[in-house]
């Protein structure tokens, strides 16, 4: 039952995300409905990990995955595109500490929504017999008041299953590195 509640909560957040792009009328908050929040060159962000959901619900995976990392926007090679790098550590679904660095790109397809992918180089005792590995990690992000809520597909380490699950984390902007 608890697993179903988590899935419903995530679906509700994603569904209500479209409502968050509506204009907010308030004396305290400026109207930013026409503003695009593209991550600008040199911007640094703090990744706060999270949660995960898995396709095999009976496997007993750990779905509370605390962790921390940094995201850096290298450049904006074209309008709506950002080239970024990540370096993070988190407690993975198999109850081991996982580390990764990644290079990726994202495309902002709507005011608050972006889609992207990264090539990650990671290491955890849980995967690939503890040896470092490369993985292609696709994802989607929703930005609200400069906070970015990210969801990425967790790739499988075997050819039997293409997707293991979905991980959710947040990126908090720290300002410009320049």
Model-derived regions, located:
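Cleavable N-terminal export/targeting peptides
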Residues: 1-41, 177-178
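Short loop/turn motifs that connect adjacent beta-strands in outer-membrane beta-barrel proteins
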Residues: 25, 33-42, 75-82, 108-115, ...
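Outer-membrane beta-barrel architecture
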Residues: 39-45, 63-67, 80-84, 98-100, ...
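Transmembrane beta-strand segments that form the barrel wall of outer-membrane beta-barrel proteins
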Residues: 46-54, 81-92, 114-125, 147-157
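Outer-membrane beta-barrel "beta-signal"
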Residues: 50-52, 61-68, 162-178
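Residues on the lipid-exposed face of transmembrane beta-strands in outer-membrane beta-barrel proteins
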Residues: 68-74, 87, 101-107, 117-121, ...
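C-terminal or internal capping secondary-structure element at the end of a domain, subdomain, or sheet
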Residues: 142-176
């Amino acid at each position: 039952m608890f697993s179903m509640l988590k899935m419903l909560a995530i679906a509700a957040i994603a569904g209500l995300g479209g409502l968050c792009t509506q204009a907010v009328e308030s004396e305290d908050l400026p109207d930013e409905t026409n503003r695009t929040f593209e991550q600008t060159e040199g911007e640094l962000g703090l990744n706060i990990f999270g949660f995960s959901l898995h396709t095999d619900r009976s496997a007993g995976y750990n779905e509370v995955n605390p962790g921390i990392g940094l995201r850096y926007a290298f450049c904006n090679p074209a309008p709506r595109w950002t080239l970024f790098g990540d370096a993070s550590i988190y407690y993975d679904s198999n109850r081991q500490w996982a580390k990764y660095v990644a290079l990726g790109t994202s495309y902002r397809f709507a005011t608050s929504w972006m889609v992207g992918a990264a090539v990650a180089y990671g290491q955890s005792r849980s995967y690939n017999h503890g040896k470092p590995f490369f993985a292609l990690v696709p994802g989607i992000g929703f930005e609200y008041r400069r906070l970015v809520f990210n969801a990425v597909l967790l790739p499988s380490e075997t050819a039997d299953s293409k997707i293991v699950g979905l991980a959710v984390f947040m990126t908090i902007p720290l300002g410009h590195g320049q």
